Amino acid sequence: MQTSNILAKIEAPLFREGIPDFRVGDTVRVHYRIVEGEKERIQVFQGVVLKRHRAGVRSTFTVRKVSFTVGVERMFLLHSPRIDKVEIVSRGVVRRSRLFYLRNLAGKAARVRDAKD
């Protein structure tokens, strides 16, 4: 058996169902499960998707938000069991696959144009 076939069999049950189809530039709300000692809570992180890395079960996406004038970026594993759900707040119109230029912009210049639905 080839290594790719073995990996495919191992990774198959790890894929999550019900993940919305979001793209770079979309504003998303990620509900992330945090375990603190014996307690467990859900933390919501809302921001613009800067990049997506599509690699099967190892897929990731980076979300950026501005909190109290400080930019905060967080990288999430798409198929992680710690992600409770991902909601799409609004669709954005961008012409790039990576939005790293938003890091250098502030205020209204850092906004992404909304898609006309």
Curated annotation (Swiss-Prot):
Keyword DNA-binding: no
GO cellular component, one term: cytosolic large ribosomal subunit
Record-linked InterPro entries: Ribosomal_bL19, Ribosomal_bL19_CS, Ribosomal_bL19_sf, Translation_prot_SH3-like_sf
PROSITE patterns (alphabetical): RIBOSOMAL_L19
Alphabetized GO MF terms: structural constituent of ribosome
Gene Ontology biological process: translation
Family assignment from sequence similarity: Belongs to the bacterial ribosomal protein bL19 family.
HAMAP family, alphabetized: Ribosomal_bL19
PANTHER family noted in UniProt: LARGE RIBOSOMAL SUBUNIT PROTEIN BL19M, RIBOSOMAL PROTEIN L19
Record protein name field: Large ribosomal subunit protein bL19
Gene from which this protein is expressed: rplS
